[in-house]
Each structure stands twice: as structure tokens, then as C-alpha cells.
UniProtKB/Swiss-Prot annotation:
Record-given protein name: Inner membrane protein YghB
Function: May be a membrane transporter required for proton motive force (PMF)-dependent drug efflux. Required, with YqjA, for the proper export of certain periplasmic amidases and, possibly, other Tat substrates. May play a role in determining membrane lipid composition.
Residue ranges of the TM segments: 18-38, 68-88, 161-181, 192-212
Subcellular location: Cell inner membrane
GO MF annotations, alphabetized: transmembrane transporter activity
Keyword line: Cell inner membrane, Cell membrane, Membrane, Transmembrane, Transmembrane helix
Phenotype of gene-disrupted mutants: Double mutants lacking both yghB and yqjA show incomplete cell division, temperature sensitivity and altered phospholipid levels. They are also hypersensitive to several compounds known to be exported by other drug efflux proteins, including ethidium bromide, methyl viologen, acriflavine and beta-lactam antibiotics. Expression of either yghB or yqjA can restore the wild-type phenotype, suggesting that these proteins have redundant functions. Both individual null mutant strains grow normally at all temperatures.
Pfam families (UniProt xref): VTT_dom
Cytoplasmic-side segments: 1-17, 89-160, 213-219
Any one GO biological process: transmembrane transport
Organism: Escherichia coli (strain K12)
């Protein structure tokens, strides 16, 4: 718990030297890994802020806190392993009450979008779906339910994971290198730190609202 407090304090104070400490940066990697794994792997956790976290990772790379290639490798593994977990849920637990309940709690627009993409493009939908919140968690579950072979799924899973992590993280890095952004570095880093928290809160409240609304309507 003390390490988490140190990380938050270092981010808030923009103390990148402290964040670059091997012990602290390993915890940062762990938190990012866990967040991406859960967001990609569990439907109830699909509200977690994966995109904004990758942008923050790119900004931290630009500040010398983390290295580019290890970050891409670690976060790609997190996203792809999480996506595999989502596929397994659909393949082996798709007909269970629990998974059906999770699917029912997702906003209808995301379910319709994922269904349309999967029906039209099959596994190729994973490449574009990775860049859409909620959809990237839902598509692997649908692939598992449809009975698609694991070998075919894994190819598109890891390819789309690498593409998503590389593009969004590189965007965060490039954004941090823009002269205007560099001149307002403190404000930008504060924004990038607050953004995932704000999105997490909004996603959690939105999910709770949908759950309560559906329970009220079914009562």
C-alpha cells in the first residue's frame, strides 16, 4: 500500500526520477498489466480505462520512466492473455447463467456493434474492435461462443493486441514530444493522470446504473 501511495505522490508531483526507481516502476508495470488483463478478459471489468492507461504509458516512456520495447511486450501480453480469457469464457462458459448475465448487463449499443462487426468480418473484427471500449472485451467472448478454433483465434488475438498497444502507446509518446505539450508538461501529465481515474469512475457509475435499471425494469 505504501508503494502505491509513493507512485501516486510521484505522479502528482511529476517526480519522474522517483517513478524510474526499479522497485516502483515494477509496481507500475504490474498495475498496468493487471488493468489491461482484466479490462480485456472479464466483461464486468470492461469499464476499466485501457486506452487512457496506454496513453499515460507512452507519456511515461517519453519521460524516461519506462523503456519502449519492454513496455510494449508486457502490455501486449496483458491485453492478449486477457482476450484469451474472454475467449475461454465464451468457449466453455458461454451457456452458463453467469456469462449470460454479464452479457445482459452490457449496454445494448455495444452488444449490437460487436455482433455486427463479428458477423460481417469474423476474426478480422478483432483488429478494429481492439480500439473500441467494451467491444474489445465482448468480441473474444462471442468468438468463443461461436466455437471458432483456438489456433485461428490466437493469431488475430496477439496481432490485434500488439497493434492496439503499439499504436495507442506510441500516440501517447508522440503527444508528449510535441513542443506545445512540452511547454505545458506539468498540466498535461496531471491531465493524463486524472483521465484514467475519471474514466474509471464514469465507467463504474455507468455500469451500476445499467445494472440497477435492468433490475428495476425486471422487478
Amino acid at each position: 500500500m505504501a508503494v502505491i501511495q509513493d507512485i501516486i505522490a510521484a505522479l502528482w508531483q511529476h517526480d519522474f526520477a522517483a517513478l524510474a526507481d526499479p522497485h516502483i516502476v515494477s509496481v507500475v508495470y504490474f498495475v498496468m498489466f493487471a488493468t489491461l488483463f482484466l479490462e480485456n478478459g472479464l466483461l464486468p471489468a470492461s469499464f476499466l480505462p485501457g486506452d487512457s492507461l496506454l496513453i499515460l504509458a507512452g507519456a511515461l516512456i517519453a519521460q524516461g520512466v519506462m523503456d519502449f520495447l519492454p513496455t510494449i511486450a508486457i502490455l501486449t501480453a496483458a491485453a492478449s492473455l486477457g482476450c484469451w480469457l474472454s475467449y475461454i469464457q465464451g468457449r466453455w462458459l458461454g451457456n452458463t447463467k453467469t456469462v449470460k448475465g454479464w452479457l445482459a448487463q452490457l449496454p445494448a449499443k455495444y452488444h449490437q456493434r460487436a455482433t455486427c462487426m463479428f458477423d460481417r468480418h469474423g476474426l478480422l473484427a478483432l483488429l478494429a474492435g481492439r480500439f473500441l471500449a467494451f467491444v474489445r472485451t465482448l468480441l473474444p467472448t462471442m468468438a468463443g461462443i461461436s466455437g471458432l478454433p483456438n489456433r485461428r483465434f490466437q493469431f488475430f488475438n496477439w496481432l490485434s493486441g500488439l497493434l492496439w498497444v503499439s499504436v495507442v502507446t506510441s500516440f501517447g509518446y508522440a503527444l508528449s514530444m510535441i513542443p506545445f505539450v512540452k511547454r505545458h508538461e506539468d498540466q498535461v501529465m496531471t491531465f493524463l493522470m486524472i483521465l484514467p481515474i475519471a474514466l474509471l469512475t464514469a465507467g463504474l457509475l455507468g455500469t451500476l446504473f445499467v445494472v440497477i435499471k435492468k433490475k428495476y425494469c425486471n422487478a
